[in-house]
Amino acid sequence: MSIEKIWAREILDSRGNPTVEVDLYTAKGLFRAAVPSGASTGIYEALELRDGDKQRYLGKGVLKAVDHINSTIAPALISSGLSVVEQEKLDNLMLELDGTENKSKFGANAILGVSLAVCKAGAAERELPLYRHIAQLAGNSDLILPVPAFNVINGGSHAGNKLAMQEFMILPVGAESFRDAMRLGAEVYHTLKGVIKDKYGKDATNVGDEGGFAPNILENSEALELVKEAIDKAGYTEKIVIGMDVAASEFYRDGKYDLDFKSPTDPSRYITGDQLGALYQDFVRDYPVVSIEDPFDQDDWAAWSKFTANVGIQIVGDDLTVTNPKRIERAVEEKACNCLLLKVNQIGSVTEAIQACKLAQENGWGVMVSHRSGETEDTFIADLVVGLCTGQIKTGAPCRSERLAKYNQLMRIEEELGDEARFAGHNFRNPSVL
């Protein structure tokens, strides 16, 4: 079934910033997709095209990207006569039209919006749920419900507190199902709210961009202590473990790291990569930390490789790998990490996201599907994580509708699968063993 019409528009994301939404029409109806956007972005990500007109949305408008879709991409895809089930051909056509390595001509936000809409239309054309269509595109016969990694304390570039490290997450690996994992996560989240309120007052329970609490604490170990206390208090010590996203590139200064980067600059307090690695070792020893994302700067390769060789936990590459096959290949070669953070808007098309996932899995890595801090009500990544069988997803706290949209969709998928539903649980790093 070929494409009849494509129309893009500018909408607002969960942070009140403009983003791209695409409507794609076939004989089967209308298929709509919206593109997310990050706050802490890796320098190697595909280019998100912003207008730069300071008189409008402080320069963050996306009318240029929208115009590229409506004026160039739409006519080309419609006249190609390609069917919406031909995801790879349609994605490749857009990449050829763009002609740049980082999608800087049209913008990754333009290409991705169309790519996501094509994928949804392709599922309808095949009369399949989106997650089954994605599984077929990836050549997967399995379908796995992921362990959710709930971001319950926000710091770094996602919050106005002094905390340097960006996310402190809970993973209900001991839950019996995805629905059960949601309950455990929500109960710990509410318990944590009480713990924070008792210690720091009601103001401290304000939430950050991803729905996590943002108490004004400085010590990262204090955040871990709060999370551990909430898990214990809720009665889930045996069922819930902790993950972190440090986003260390955000506080990398002159070859060192500044754990108080939101205060005035003072090079005397900077620490080395080795010292930071030792701090993580303490965290792993003292708390049930099983996953650390972006522990070092995106170009501090030596620190990554050294640390990954010395710990047995999951080390996730986000800014390091930016869902880019070339960066993933280098990280595999240098043994820099052992898990890929998969963000569709870092690479900019469904086909390339699937390829990046397969590349990581073929090299024995785990894969965690991820939202961005600037999200929309679009639920594509919920279907993506099931279809790609990655076993783990992070899409914020169990709070804020743009986060719950994804989690709720996953509960619907689990219900739809019925007896066929399998939950990754303790095997979240390697769900293929299920």
From Swiss-Prot:
Phosphothreonine: residues bearing it: 26
Gene Ontology biological process: canonical glycolysis; gluconeogenesis; glycolytic process; response to estradiol; response to xenobiotic stimulus
Tissue-specificity statement: The alpha/alpha homodimer is expressed in embryo and in most adult tissues. The alpha/beta heterodimer and the beta/beta homodimer are found in striated muscle, and the alpha/gamma heterodimer and the gamma/gamma homodimer in neurons.
PROSITE patterns: ENOLASE (PS00164)
Annotated GO CC locations: cell cortex; cell surface; cytosol; extracellular exosome; extracellular space; growth cone; membrane; membrane raft
Top-level taxonomic group: Eukaryota
Protein's pathway: Carbohydrate degradation; glycolysis; pyruvate from D-glyceraldehyde 3-phosphate: step 4/5
SMART domains associated with the record: Enolase_C, Enolase_N
Compartment list: Cytoplasm; Cell membrane
Binding site for substrate: 158, 167, 293, 318, 370-373, 394
EC number annotated for this UniProt entry: 4.2.1.11
Pfam families listed in its UniProt record: Enolase_C (PF00113), Enolase_N (PF03952)
Cross-link Glycyl lysine isopeptide (Lys-Gly) (interchain with G-Cter in SUMO2) mapped to chain: 202
Active site: 210 (proton donor), 343 (proton acceptor)
Sequence positions that bind Mg(2+) 1: 40
Protein name: Gamma-enolase
Organism: Homo sapiens
Gene responsible for this protein: ENO2
